[in-house]
A protein has these predicted regions:
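Cross-family detector of peptidyl-prolyl cis-trans isomerase
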Residues: 2-9, 14-144
Length: 144
């Protein structure tokens, strides 16, 4: 039991944490569930280049976007910039190229090395099906 726990801690702490070069330009807090790692979330968003050119808009499509945080379904800037938000919240974030589409860009829509600005509204948050242990819970497990 202790070996499994130590191995999990090893995995958690051995992966480098990317410095969050995300700029939060506007933040309207929500009041619902908080986004944590592996939360399934549903959002509406607008994506723009730094010059104001809109490249994507889920409101215009009238279809929210659903994905799971922490599973690399979206760019890293979204992973970092949305964690901690709450259901009902709205946030405008500026994402540097290295946390967006980088040197390659994304087709004809997003040029290489582009800063991206996203206006995101959190519509729904579903927490993962496992319990997050607190430090005291971990100590109790270690004592057994």
């Amino acid at each position: 039991m202790k070996i499994n726990f130590l191995f999990i801690l090893f995995l958690i702490f051995c992966f480098p944490v990317h410095p969050a070069n995300i700029q939060i330009l506007n933040d309207i807090p929500g009041t619902g569930k908080t986004i944590i790692n592996h939360s399934k979330i549903k959002v509406h968003y607008k994506g723009k280049l730094e010059n104001g050119t809109e490249f994507d808009n889920s409101y215009k499509r009238k279809k929210p976007f659903s994905f799971q945080i922490g599973t690399r379904q979206v760019i890293e800037g979204w992973e970092i910039g949305l964690k901690g938000m709450k259901e009902g919240g709205k946030r405008t974030i500026m994402i540097p190229p290295d946390l967006g589409y980088g040197k390659t860009g994304a087709g004809n829509l997003i040029p290489p090395n582009s800063k991206l600005i996203f206006e995101v509204e959190i519509l729904e948050v579903q927490h993962p099906g496992y319990k997050i242990l607190k430090v005291n819970d971990i100590k109790k497990v270690m004592e057994k």
